[in-house]
Structures are given as structure tokens and as C-alpha cells.
A protein has these predicted regions:
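Short beta-strand micro-motifs enriched in acidic
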Residues: 43-45, 107, 132-136
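An acidic-aromatic
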Residues: 41-89, 152-153
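Glycine-centered tight beta-turn/hairpin loop motif at sheet-sheet or coil-to-beta transitions
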Residues: 33-35, 55, 72, 123-126, ...
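Flexible, surface-exposed loop/linker segments and immediately adjacent secondary-structure boundaries
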Residues: 80-111
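Non-transmembrane domains of secretory- and envelope-associated proteins
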Residues: 110-111, 121-127, 134-186
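Short beta-strand segments that buttress and anchor functional surface loops
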Residues: 26-29, 50-54, 115-122, 141-145
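N-terminal leader/targeting segments and the immediate start of mature chains
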Residues: 1-35, 47-48, 73, 172-186
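One face of beta-strands
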Residues: 21-27, 38-42, 47-51, 127, ...
Length: 186
């Protein structure tokens, strides 16, 4: 088994080890042979994140996860142990913890980039991943094979360190009125 302690992967780990990381990505998911495309903006900070994309806004403060659909005025609140579903819906959330969920099966150089094939070592809804990293540890793309047979491909448009946010940033600041359907599964 190859070690994650090598230049691009170590740089990626350091990027997530303190502060926050902002990621803008486009993705395509093949569901029952039909492509579903979209984009997302993610801010990851430790076990917390904020995600926006395709009409949904997701907050995770480390304890609770809110999935908000503004157009249908619905919000689902779950405990953060429901991250399994979040990883399947947006595998880029796993980037901060690649070495906790995967082992390196193989790697190859492609110019100054490194392409990794990773096998899951922990149940996260993803059985295999192919991730391409720039020499500085930035993720350029990923292809994630879900356990249900579907595949998610992501192209990272931008990825950068950003200032650390207050923990309150990772919880919705608004109240959901009586015109909202709120499902609280905590």
C-alpha cells in the first residue's frame, strides 16, 4: 500500500489542516444511464462545510446538517452522522479526509500532475475514486464510483485557501417560517 505522505497528497492534506478551503466545481453524475449535470461552490473547514449548487444550499456545523431547497421552501435537518449521503451526493466533500477513507491503488504522472486511483477502505458510499492533483496539491478533477453503480465526475474550476470562518457561518442564520416544510430528523 502506497503512503499518502508524498508531495501532492501531503500538500492537499496541509491545505485542509487549518483554515478553510473554497472549491468551485462542475460535475456530471450518470444515474440510470442519464447524465445529470450541475455546479457547486463549497467552503470546507474541518468537519464543517457550506455548499451551494443547483438550487440547494447545505450547511453542516459539525453537529447538524441542513439541506435547504429555497424554491420549494423545504428544509431537512439531519445529524452529521448522515454524512454518508452527503459524500454520495457530493464526493468533493471527502477531499479533506481522503487518507481516512481510501488507500492508493496506483498512481501515474501526467505532465506535472499526478493521477491517483484510490480504493475505499471505509464505507462512505464510494467504492473507488480517480483523482488528479496538481503538483501543489490542488485537485483538478475526480471520478467517483458509487457503491450503487452510478459514477460522479467532477472538474474543479478553482480551489484555494481562504480565511477561517466563525462556526456560526456553517449554520443557517434565518428562521424557517410556517410557509416552510421543515423535516427535523435529529
Amino acid at each position: 500500500m502506497q503512503s499518502f505522505a508524498q508531495p501532492p497528497l501531503e500538500s492537499l492534506r496541509r491545505m485542509f489542516s487549518s483554515g478553510a478551503v473554497s472549491i468551485s466545481a462542475e460535475y456530471e453524475m450518470i444515474v440510470q444511464q442519464m447524465p445529470v449535470v450541475g455546479n457547486s461552490e463549497i467552503l470546507l473547514q474541518g468537519k464543517m462545510y457550506h455548499l451551494q449548487g443547483n438550487g440547494l444550499e447545505v450547511f453542516c456545523n459539525g453537529d447538524a446538517l441542513w439541506t435547504i431547497d429555497e424554491s420549494s421552501k423545504e428544509v431537512v435537518i439531519e445529524p452529521c452522522d448522515a454524512l454518508y449521503d452527503a459524500y454520495v451526493a457530493n464526493p468533493l466533500l471527502l477531499l479533506a479526509e481522503l487518507d481516512s477513507y481510501f488507500q492508493i491503488k496506483s498512481q501515474k504522472q501526467a505532465g506535472s500532475n499526478t493521477e491517483y486511483v484510490l480504493d475505499a477502505i471505509k464505507d462512505c458510499g464510494i467504492s473507488k475514486a480517480q483523482v488528479t492533483l496538481a503538483s501543489d496539491g490542488r485537485v483538478l478533477s475526480g471520478k467517483f464510483h458509487l457503491e450503487d453503480g452510478n459514477v460522479v465526475s467532477a472538474k474543479v474550476i478553482s480551489m484555494k485557501k481562504t480565511e477561517e470562518r466563525s462556526p456560526s457561518f456553517f449554520s443557517p442564520s434565518r428562521k424557517f417560517g410556517s410557509d416552510w416544510v421543515v423535516t427535523d430528523l435529529r
